[in-house]
């Protein structure tokens, strides 16, 4: 029986002084361990998704943690019959998720996590609004029943949407959601920085929610868009193959 391919996604907002210096080290261990995928490095932290054997993707993650020294890392592992990535890339970026807002310190200043098991109960409270921080083409594929779609083409447009919708957000508990946690985490930092106090985000994102809850209350509708060769997954995390997902 062939071993399943492990797909590991990990991110952390942590100060990295010289991220460019880490690139050759990560490429070396990744290629030695036959790992494929993409790792983004920036002064604000790292964000990566890569595939290989379970042992090898964890060895690459261990090296990444050793080189960057984060206090905590958000990690998610799924499995596939094939590699969803073609090769290994390690890239230097200004931000690990581009918002184009200077001065955010997400590591120290962000909203509160809501565990997947508590999410359904939390978002059905009357004073809670849910904001899907993903792009509109992702939301089209699937989202939560009550979620607001900001109709953004890129994450860089999200800060402008917030500025234009302050009356909508005023006096509410704001619950952010995204695929794996990183965009909603950075979004909470933005909202906290401009004065919103009750800001929350789904820990581990939609993928962790679907794995932990199996969508038992049917608050999630549709599939979840993913940025690899699977294109989207169902609420049991099975890959979706449909012509309209070929972008």
Curated annotation (Swiss-Prot):
Similarity comment: family membership: Belongs to the TrhO family.
PANTHER family: RHODANESE-LIKE DOMAIN-CONTAINING PROTEIN 7-RELATED, THIOSULFATE SULFURTRANSFERASE/RHODANESE-LIKE DOMAIN-CONTAINING PROTEIN 2
Domain Rhodanese: 124-218
GO biological process terms held by the UniProt record: tRNA modification
UniProt xrefs under SUPFAM superfamilies: Rhodanese/Cell cycle control phosphatase
GO MF terms, alphabetically ordered: oxidoreductase activity, acting on paired donors, with incorporation or reduction of molecular oxygen
Descriptive protein name: tRNA uridine(34) hydroxylase
Organism of this sequence: Rickettsia conorii (strain ATCC VR-613 / Malish 7)
Tagged with keyword tRNA processing: yes
Keywords: Oxidoreductase, tRNA processing
Catalytic residues (positions): 178
EC number(s) from the headed UniProt entry: 1.14.-.-
Function: Catalyzes oxygen-dependent 5-hydroxyuridine (ho5U) modification at position 34 in tRNAs.
InterPro entries the UniProt entry points to: Rhodanese-like_dom (IPR001763), Rhodanese-like_dom_sf (IPR036873), TrhO (IPR020936), TRHO_N (IPR040503)
Catalysed reactions, semicolon-separated: uridine(34) in tRNA + AH2 + O2 = 5-hydroxyuridine(34) in tRNA + A + H2O
Enzyme class name: oxidoreductase
């Amino acid at each position: 029986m062939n071993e399943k391919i492990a797909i590991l996604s990990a991110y952390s907002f942590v100060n990295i002084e010289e991220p460019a210096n880490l690139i050759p080290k990560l490429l070396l261990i990744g290629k030695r361990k036959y790992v494929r995928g993409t790792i983004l490095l920036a002064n604000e932290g790292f964000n990566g998704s890569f595939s290989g054997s379970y042992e090898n993707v964890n060895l690459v993650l261990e090296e990444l943690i050793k080189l960057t020294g984060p206090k905590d890392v958000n990690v998610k592992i799924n499995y596939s019959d094939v590699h969803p990535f073609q090769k290994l890339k390690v890239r230097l970026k200004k931000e690990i998720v581009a918002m184009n807002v200077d001065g955010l310190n997400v590591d120290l200043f962000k909203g509160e996590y809501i565990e997947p098991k508590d999410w359904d109960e939390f978002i059905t409270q009357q004073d809670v609004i849910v904001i899907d921080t993903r792009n509109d083409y992702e939301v089209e594929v699937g989202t939560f029943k009550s979620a607001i779609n900001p109709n953004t083409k890129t994450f860089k447009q999200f800060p402008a949407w917030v500025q234009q919708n302050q009356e909508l957000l005023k006096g509410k508990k704001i619950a952010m959601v995204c695929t794996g946690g990183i965009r909603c985490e950075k979004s909470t930092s933005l909202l906290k920085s401009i004065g919103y106090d009750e800001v929350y985000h789904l820990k581990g994102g939609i993928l962790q929610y679907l794995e932990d809850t199996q969508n038992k209350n049917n608050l999630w509708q549709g599939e979840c868009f993913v940025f690899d060769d699977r294109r989207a997954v169902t609420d049991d995390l099975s890959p979706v193959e449909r012509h309209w997902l070929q972008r």
